Amino acid sequence: MALGTLFLALAAGLSTASPPNILLIFADDLGYGDLGSYGHPSSTTPNLDQLAEGGLRFTDFYVPVSLCTPSRAALLTGRLPVRSGMYPGVLGPSSQGGLPLEEVTLAEVLAARGYLTGMAGKWHLGVGPEGAFLPPHQGFHRFLGIPYSHDQGPCQNLTCFPPDIPCKGGCDQGLVPIPLLANLTVEAQPPWLPGLEARYVSFSRDLMADAQRQGRPFFLYYASHHTHYPQFSGQSFTKRSGRGPFGDSLMELDGAVGALMTTVGDLGLLEETLVIFTADNGPELMRMSNGGCSGLLRCGKGTTFEGGVREPALVYWPGHITPGVTHELASSLDLLPTLAALTGAPLPNVTLDGVDISPLLLGTGKSPRKSVFFYPPYPDEIHGVFAVRNGKYKAHFFTQGSAHSDTTSDPACHAANRLTAHEPPLLYDLSQDPGENYNVLESIEGVSPEALQALKHIQLLKAQYDAAMTFGPSQIAKGEDPALQICCQPSCTPHPVCCHCPGSQS
């Protein structure tokens, strides 16, 4: 048997004999430069750093859109959010739309393979009438979490750090307090934020233990609210990080990762559990020291520059994945087809934008991904993709700043930088210039034939991609209905402030 055939046979046997448990940890508004393993000098992230040391650390891992709702849709479906209608912007508490039920999620793929599926944390893919778009209707057997960002409701009277440090800012006004849901039932409204991460960890432990008792593999999607603004943490992490509220929030996220890994170890499942860590988009730089760090990369959340779309990513599976660092291209879109391959689950009968990178993970080959296409948070079919990376080169056909990346020293990041077309496109060699500082088409040494050929190829890729892409009907354009806001006391008055059932401080 040829060596390549042997590797394929081993991978096939792995996917059918004993599919691994899957722990997918998704951080919120975390920058490329925020973790210790990615070079931050003062972050306290020992558990994540341990995953990086014992697993595969990606240097070139991307999300297709640098905003919460579309990025989460891409992660769970393996499809660009313009296909599923998850644009423009984000869904809110009153949104009538959501992730269409005909979209096939990673949870549905794995549930059909026999997995016990659960989600803890931030959903942000719609609520809908009677909770029609919530996780229990999208393939998750169990759900404990908040259906959108925790700043999408008034927070001026909430405690973010114990014993009584209030949340910074006022968050969104005129809405119901944020609800914590257990499946489709309101558990607390609003929940005690300093105790929220601990509740998620407890929920996750129970799910993993129950799956083992049932003799089933588990899929846990742990979508932490950390490090989204306003930051919060429990007593064990408050004022402990040395990096202020953001650092405390990040430290609690790291602590949760440690607690989850301890549970996996206590259950004797370390070599049977594939752990993936990444984040939805780059840092919200407008928050300054409370907004995270994109490291060497340009701009952050809301932009198609590297700081908005390149994310830390770690994959850990002892005995199966050799520790190291990879510079291969990969995307959050790739997780669904990759996990389907590793578990022996059939792919959904839809157009997927992700590719199977299991050969890269298992050390039997390279990533088949050669290009990454980036849409802005507010896309349209006229402009199509704003930027394309192919190999080491990235071209920006359009750029646009974002309020999320205000306050930086780079005006290209700011909301005041309106939509700008570039002809010829801006072209960067990311192998030498990951910060996108030097347009190679303006090099004082002249433009190399290689760069010109790369530009020509990327221009062709964009033209072909835009021509082939069909935007799905926008779910966000369906508008809002305040009656859809979740309320623990639906007929109470005065609405929405009467929707107040805080529960216990635990």
From Swiss-Prot:
Reactions accelerated catalytically: an N-acyl-1-beta-D-(3-O-sulfo)-galactosyl-sphing-4-enine + H2O = a beta-D-galactosyl-(1<->1')-N-acylsphing-4-enine + sulfate + H(+)
Function recorded in the entry: Hydrolyzes cerebroside sulfate.
Ligand binding (substrate): K122, S149, H228, K301
Family: Belongs to the sulfatase family.
The name this protein goes by in its record: Arylsulfatase A
InterPro entries: Alkaline_phosphatase_core_sf, Sulfatase, Sulfatase_CS, Sulfatase_N
Organism: Mus musculus
Active site: C68, H124
